[in-house]
């Protein structure tokens, strides 16, 4: 029997996906199989629980949604790989800090496959290349189970990041995989990063699914 279901969902609207995550987490029990949801979102700013309104400088035509994850404001859009981690931390005897570290290290290993030297920072969660942020993290834990997750910039229009202070840091530089790896695609990065996450989180029986 699978101990992890990996869903490739394509492009999904943010609100419906967030509601689905909350519902999944509220209704799961100790026998529920963990899931990873891999997708892209249409253009949207999301403001985390620690977010301040002044960090949203000029949203313009992009909607802003107040959400229940940790962290501050970030941007999602086509060409960015989003992976939501619906993990029973109690079952895995995993603390939140250990989960964050496992995610960051999986991203670092994934990028290294393409010759990109990346690293986390102790003062600002996420993964960075030469000081520029390439991946953001924001999690919520409820009843010992995680939801929300990571966003890796792959091959996207980066302009909307200039409309905010990403993660609450004024002037933070952002970058993406395609800056360093020609031809980078969300599909390829999804395949590589899921493999590293599975290894880092210790799942052994993985079931791949297309769609819900």
Swiss-Prot record:
Keywords: Acyltransferase, Cytoplasm, Transferase
A GO BP annotation: protein modification process
Binding site residues for substrate: 69-76, 136-138, 149-151
Superkingdom: Bacteria
Pfam families hit by this protein: LplA-B_cat
Chain positions of site Lowers pKa of active site Cys: 133
The reaction(s) this protein catalyses: octanoyl-[ACP] + L-lysyl-[protein] = N(6)-octanoyl-L-lysyl-[protein] + holo-[ACP] + H(+)
Cellular component terms per the entry's GO annotation: cytoplasm
Family matches, as PROSITE patterns: BPL_LPL_CATALYTIC, LIPB
Gene Ontology molecular functions: lipoyl(octanoyl) transferase activity
Active-site positions on this chain: 167 (acyl-thioester intermediate)
Family: Belongs to the LipB family.
Known function: Catalyzes the transfer of endogenously produced octanoic acid from octanoyl-acyl-carrier-protein onto the lipoyl domains of lipoate-dependent enzymes. Lipoyl-ACP can also act as a substrate although octanoyl-ACP is likely to be the physiological substrate.
Extra remark: In the reaction, the free carboxyl group of octanoic acid is attached via an amide linkage to the epsilon-amino group of a specific lysine residue of lipoyl domains of lipoate-dependent enzymes.
PANTHER family tied to this protein: LIPOYLTRANSFERASE 2, MITOCHONDRIAL-RELATED, OCTANOYLTRANSFERASE
Protein name: Octanoyltransferase
Originating organism: Marinobacter nauticus (strain ATCC 700491 / DSM 11845 / VT8) (Marinobacter aquaeolei)
